[in-house]
Regions:
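Alpha-helical scaffold domains
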Residues: 1-161
């Protein structure tokens, strides 16, 4: 990684365990590795920001169980990890809808963020879901937007769009 990018990530909330690997280099690694659930789990468990983002990129979303997804979401402590997790794993998993509702109800900032990102993903990717199905969540967004943690608040903007 690069020190400049590492400093940038850390100033935005990434913890000390961050190398500062660029998204372009992570994408190159993803292409080189392909899907590798065993490596993804090892990288995720290392608790390194860059490793968790890459883990989300190389995980097999269809193989992940609901308990595994719940375990991973509770490990998230940086918004870019949450975004990578939802876009690469959660949005392509059969449990997306059920987890979305559970995570939106969470008090944990990054869990809630992932819930709203999952909702935005479902709304954009699945035209068979009637708009009315998101009504309760949209009312919740309107009600709690002012008091929601910052990353959850940002994710609600994606869900609202």
């Amino acid at each position: 990684g690069k020190e400049e990018l590492r400093s940038q990530y850390r100033s935005r909330g990434a913890g000390e365990n961050c190398f500062g690997v660029s998204p372009a280099n992570l994408n190159k690694l993803k292409k080189k590795i392909g899907v590798d659930p065993v490596l993804a789990l090892a990288l995720w468990n290392f608790k390194n920001t860059d490793g968790q983002i890459l883990a989300a990129m190389i995980a097999d979303p269809q193989e992940m169980t609901e308990p595994q997804l719940n375990a991973w979401v509770r490990d998230i402590d940086y918004y870019l990890v949450g975004e990578a997790f939802v876009s690469n794993v959660v949005s392509k998993n059969v449990f997306t809808k059920a987890l979305m509702l559970e995570w939106i109800a969470s008090k944990e900032e990054y869990v809630k963020q992932c819930g709203y990102l999952a909702m935005a993903s479902l709304a954009q990717q699945d035209p068979t879901i009637p708009d009315g199905e998101f009504t309760d969540q949209l009312y919740a967004i309107a009600h709690e937007l002012q008091n929601a943690p910052s990353r959850a608040r940002e994710a609600t903007r994606s869900a609202w769009a």
